[in-house]
Every structure is written in structure tokens, then in C-alpha cells.
Amino acid sequence: MTVLIDGRAAVRPELGGVERWARELCARLPALRPDRYAVARPPAALAHRAGHAWEQGVLPFRARRAALLLGPANLAPVAFPRNVVVIHDAAVLREPGWYSAAYARWHGALLPAIARGAKRVITVSAFSARELRELAGVEAAVVAGGVDARFTPGADPGPARAALGLEGPYVLCVASRIARKNLAALYETGARLAARGIDLVAAGGERPQFRAARAPATGPRDLGPVPDAHLPGLYAGASAFVLPSLYEGFGLPCLEAMACGTTVVAADAAALPETCGDAALYADPHDPAAIANAVERALDPSTSQGLLAAALERAAAFTWDATARGVDAVIDELLGTDSTMHAMHAKR
């Protein structure tokens, strides 16, 4: 074994973009190179515990014989000298007010320390690479995320509709209940759409370390966290998908919706135009009226049919196998250029 992967985020009960990345890398890298990769999973007592006992305490000991330690979910042991870390965005540095005060203080110091001490930083978009260069003073290799083959226009919406109580047509948003997802604008957009007879439903869980807007009495229906098995059908059954985020390091739900043949309305902000390309409609995230108007355009059959081929082609360009190969190429470069480190640990 040459490279140990931190598997903590892969076993978290919540499932956002970071956790999806961790799960996919923990599965695909050992399959790609079984002689190179192994996964370190925390014991049950530490797997879901708040704090950093695993990353900063147990994990460095587990990785002591590894040539490299790969952290796929923003975190790595600060004192470990052979980290490769995937940092998905620099949101905590760009806008600390999106987070609880304690989280912003701790991670605002921890993220730059991890990044500057790493052998290599990987990030998920050119946008995030620019943010890390500006705010943390580090260069990052860009490796985009992927879309699982489960997300397809043929996904059956029936089980998701039945389980979640969805009867009529709906517009979907999949996003955690955190401030940078622009929930205030989403809720106002939902109210505007409801006045026009359009139902907006929102799926995603809360994270206590992040600040979030409170849902008003009128607005989108809140589904809460949705089981992963229902997501493809939920996307495929939607009349349109909307993600009005102020800040995304990548924007994976947009690609998942595209892969299911659902027209996407995205904020023209952060990494979303980079990820979605010309396969989505865009709106100013600060203007709920513009978002609602873009959703209405997405519901027009002539618009949605015009975007369908581009959306399917765009989503097909992002695969988790390609992500794994991209990360492995970064590891190859490190092990190949640092031959002394590689030889030393190969002998152990």
C-alpha cells in the first residue's frame, strides 16, 4: 500500500457534494489501482463524532507507513508531512459570515494551514483554484467531479413520488439548508412561482455549523434530506431544476439533473457557469424575480427541448472514473517526482 485515503467523509450520514466525492474516490481508486490505494475508515465511535479526533489524532498514526495520505473532503492532519488534500472551495475564507462563529474561526485558520502544508492540493474547478490562490496563497490541480450512471432520463420517478408524497408537476432544488445556497432568494422564488401555479420543492438537510435562512410559511415545500436511492427519480420527475446558489465550488446537482434530462436554471455566479456551460439557463442569484422568470422559461417545451441534447452531452462529459484517473495522475506525478520519498516508504 502506497497511498492511504481518509474514509471518514465517505461514511457520514449526510450526503452533499463533498461526501459524494469521498464515497466515489474511496470506491474507485482502490478498484483502479488495488496495489496503490487503501481506505482508512474510522471506528464507529469516531465516525460521526463532531470535532477532529480522527483527522488530527488517529489518522496520522494509521498513515505513518504510507507514502501519501489523501484527504478527499477538505481535511487532513495538519502535522502530517505527506498530505494530498482535495479542497472543494474557499467559501469559509471568502465569506465567514455564512458559518457559525466557532466554525469560521477554526476552519478559517485550519484550511490555509492544511493547504500550505500539503504536498499537493487538488480542487474541483478552475473557479475554486482561483479562490484558493487568492485567499489561501496555494496553487491547486483541477480535477472535476462526475455523475453516476444511475442518473439517467430513464430513471423511474414513481418510487420517489410515492415515498415523498409528490403528486403533481414540480420544480426541484437539491441543496443543503445553508446560507450560501441562497435560501432567502429560493424561498421568495418559490412564493412567486406558487402565485403562478407552479410548485417548487426543495430537498436537502440542515447542517448546524452553517447559517441558514428560515423557511417562510409560503414558498417551496421542504422535503428535508432525501434518501440517495430516490435522487435519480426525483430529478427525472421534475419539470425543471433550479440552483440559485451564491457560491458553489462545482455544482454537482446541476449535472445530475442534466443527466436525468431535466432543464437546469443556475445562478450566474461562482463555479456554476463553468460547470454547466451552455447547457443551462442562468439568472442573477440576487434577483428572485429573474430566477422565477428563468424557471418559467425552462418550463416552456421549446426551451427545454432546445437544451436537452446539450444538457445530456454536458453531463456525459463528467464521470467518476475520469475523476479517479485525474486524482491518480496527480498521485503519479508526486510519486514519480519524489523518488526518494517513494523508495523510503516502499521499503517499510
Annotate each language-model stretch with its function.
Residues 1-348:
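Carbohydrate transferase catalytic cores enriched for Leloir-type hexosyltransferases
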